[in-house]
């Protein structure tokens, strides 16, 4: 976690100014002395990994002041300023919680780069996911990635978890970091969320509008659900179970993006947590493993080559993959969020037999002499037709 530290070893007195919680650029009191747990000595490590002792000078914001007991205001420490290149939610997102790390401080930069070298040498990691990327200064993140990639002599994959429904915020972050890391396609997730709750009234022709999958496909990490959006989480935006197979077909069987499968969607899950009504709720997550395995099989063997889209109908979409010399067999995908439907689509294989690997529709489809076929799906469902 590059944005903050918590659970320090000692209190420290600092000069700081309290700021408004909902607009952190606005001071709500004078500069004053506070006491916060900003000293991190890590006594158990005994300097083995780093000689840096973290103190108040290495943080720009804190979320505690123990001089008056119970003071949980946000304080900007003297003489720090908030970064200007981060997202401007709450005036600035240069603070998430606890003790916010000042990545402009040279000692902080050196220590985080040293950690990058250590984690590379110790684990052989082949990539990084930056949780809460909205709270990180893009310029330092870019510098850190360049350093660690040069050190490792590998093109380490990197993805930022930047929870913004507005795709323009993601474009801005990508631009600021020079395209050094991919981004979670949060706008696509919200399109799935809305479509799943629209009762068949969502215009599927617009399912990719305003998404990285459509606008920057080589930097889009696509997902259906994750730990942020699942039930009872702070950013709850559930994709309803009936729609998840349609959504997974879209991220796994198209050429755009780097798809992720959520553990809870694959294995299912069960937990109890507190809802917004402050009452406990029992949650069961359905396993979609049967169909996800079918999609993964189709992705491996058939989702190759040119892609033709058939997005003319508001309730029924389709696309085809025509194959490559190494993976010559074709595939046709058709899905509907309302009544069952069909798409007349080209697969480039004349007089060829196709079967539905999802097993939703029995029987076979044969293409005509021009390589076109009538591929069907059931209502609120998806079928994946592959060359026999």
Stretch-by-stretch model annotation:
Residues 2-5, 11-47, 51, 56, ...:
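Active-site-proximal helices and loops of the catalytic beta/alpha 8
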Residues 53, 76-123, 133:
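Active-site-adjacent "subsite" loops/lids of carbohydrate-active enzymes
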Residues 58-62, 69:
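Intrinsically disordered, low-complexity transcriptional activation domains
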Residues 73:
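Surface-exposed loop and adjacent secondary-structure segments within mature catalytic domains
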């Amino acid at each position: 976690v590059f944005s903050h530290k918590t659970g320090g070893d000692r209190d420290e007195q600092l000069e700081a100014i309290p700021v408004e919680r909902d607009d952190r650029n606005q001071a709500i009191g004078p500069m004053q002395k506070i006491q916060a747990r900003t000293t991190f000595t890590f006594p158990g490590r005994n300097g083995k990994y780093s000689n840096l002792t973290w103190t108040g000078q290495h943080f720009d914001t804190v979320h505690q002041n123990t001089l008056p007991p119970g003071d949980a205001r946000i304080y900007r420490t003297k003489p720090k300023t908030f970064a200007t290149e981060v997202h401007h939610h709450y005036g600035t997102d240069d603070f998430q919680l606890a003790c916010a790390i000042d990545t402009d401080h040279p000692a902080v930069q050196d220590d985080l780069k040293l950690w990058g070298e250590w984690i590379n040498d110790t684990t052989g990691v082949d990539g990084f996911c930056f949780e809460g990327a909205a709270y990180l200064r893009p310029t330092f993140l870019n510098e850190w990635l360049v350093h660690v990639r040069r050190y490792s002599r590998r093109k380490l994959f990197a993805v930022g978890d930047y929870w913004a429904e507005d795709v323009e915020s993601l474009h801005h972050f990508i631009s600021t970091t020079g395209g050094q890391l991919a981004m979670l396609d949060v706008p696509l997730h919200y399109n799935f969320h809305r479509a799943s709750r629209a009762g068949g009234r969502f215009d599927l022709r617009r399912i990719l509008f305003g998404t990285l999958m459509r606008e920057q496909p080589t930097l889009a990490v696509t997902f259906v659900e994750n730990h942020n959006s699942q039930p009872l989480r702070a950013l709850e935006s559930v994709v309803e179970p009936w729609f998840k197979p349609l959504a997974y077909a879209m991220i796994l069987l198209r050429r755009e993006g780097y798809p992720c499968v959520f553990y809870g969607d694959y294995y299912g899950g069960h937990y109890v947590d507190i809802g917004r009504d402050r009452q406990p709720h029992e949650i069961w997550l359905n396993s979609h493993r049967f169909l996800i395995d079918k999609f993964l099989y189709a992705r491996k063997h058939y989702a190759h080559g040119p892609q033709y889209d058939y997005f003319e109908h508001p309730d029924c979409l389709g696309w085809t993959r025509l194959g490559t010399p190494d993976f010559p067999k074709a595939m046709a995908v058709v899905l509907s969020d309302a009544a069952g439907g069909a798409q007349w689509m080209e697969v480039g294989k004349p007089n060829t037999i196709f079967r539905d690997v999802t097993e939703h529709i029995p029987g076979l489809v044969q293409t005509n002499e021009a390589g076109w076929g009538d591929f069907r799906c059931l209502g609120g469902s998806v079928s994946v037709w592959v060359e026999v």
